[in-house]
Amino acid sequence: CELFINGDYRGVYVLMEKIKRDNNRIDIEELNSDETEGDDLTGGYILKFDWGGTGENNGGFNSEYDGNLYNYHYPKPDEIAEEQEEYIYQFIYDFETIMVSPNYNDIETGYSNITNIGSFVDMIILQELSKNVDAYRLSTYIYKNIDSVDGKLTAGPIWDLNHGYGNCDYGETWLTDGWLIEYNPEGGDQMTFWWGKIWEDE
């Protein structure tokens, strides 16, 4: 929105709500630290791709395949139980194992069986339209609900577009051609490999 204060123009601002588990935000099951077995253990979880060791990003795990960091967003790092850490780590490991296989997009055994594909497609479309330089790598969320409701991995919601729509002096994001998903800089904030695999899937 464009902000004016007492008739004085103050610029363009992007207003966004914080990402959190809530019936009116990310509507997944509440996961308490004592829920460590059965269906209760399967959700809900919110993971975030972002810089490690900054702000609330002080707990998580690294991918066994490309080393990228999955930050715990919900439950928080100081609230997640060991069994819950083991569960979500194994779920992501199983997902990534499918994604590195040559048959990752097989209708019967591929990633479509454990992901909400539409949410990943929506995420890619929105990130590409906004040319958000942080896309896929930073301020990017995925979540998993409890199995008895919908245990598939889901992308989103989209968040933090302050470097979108050409409002950035790197990554050539001001250009109206080309694909942002092909921008993957070196330096510790790489895009995890499976975004490219989803992009390539016909």
What are these regions (language model features)?
Residues 1-202:
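Phosphate/dinucleotide-binding and metal-coordinating scaffold of catalytic cores
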